[in-house]
Amino acid sequence: MFNRPNRNDVDDGVQDIQNDVNQLADSLESVLKSWGSDAKGEAEAARSKAQALLKETRARMHGRTRVQQAARDAVGCADSFVRERPWCSVGTAAAVGIFIGALLSMRKS
């Protein structure tokens, strides 16, 4: 009925984007290196700013990859827990629902 994207398709898309960004960063780095010592004044400032931006972008990409992997691991653990203990999961969800309902009813009073 509903067409949800396959997790592997999403992971492949994320990997493709990361590869594209890495290729772009590599080509920017090679351009900056080839620009080399001919740069003076403003060009040198632009070069150093571009290098700083490149380092920052690579650091962010590395951090996001680590966070994405941690999120995938957490989802995998939750999925296996629910599949192994479905009634425990239903009970936990019901208890959380009752707790939230009690909090909301106290708030209205």
UniProtKB/Swiss-Prot annotation:
Kindly give the membrane topology term recorded for this protein.
Answer: Single-pass membrane protein
InterPro entries per record: DUF883_C, DUF883_N, YqjD/ElaB
Kindly state which keywords UniProt assigns to this record, in alphabetical order.
Answer: Cell inner membrane, Cell membrane, Membrane, Transmembrane, Transmembrane helix
The protein's predominant localisation is membrane
Does Cell membrane appear among the keywords?
A: yes
Residue spans crossing the bilayer: 87-106
User: Superkingdom, according to UniProt?
Assistant: Bacteria
Expression induction or repression: Maximally expressed between 6 and 12 hours of growth, in early stationary phase.
Q: Where is this protein found? A: Cell inner membrane
Gene Ontology cellular-component annotations? cytosol; plasma membrane
Cell membrane among keywords = yes
GO MF term set: ribosome binding
Q: How does it assemble?
A: Upon overexpression binds to ribosomes.
Instruction: Name the family the entry cites.
Output: Belongs to the ElaB/YgaM/YqjD family.
The name this protein carries in UniProt is: Uncharacterized protein YgaM
Originating species? Escherichia coli (strain K12)
Q: List the taxonomic lineage.
A: Bacteria, Pseudomonadati, Pseudomonadota, Gammaproteobacteria, Enterobacterales
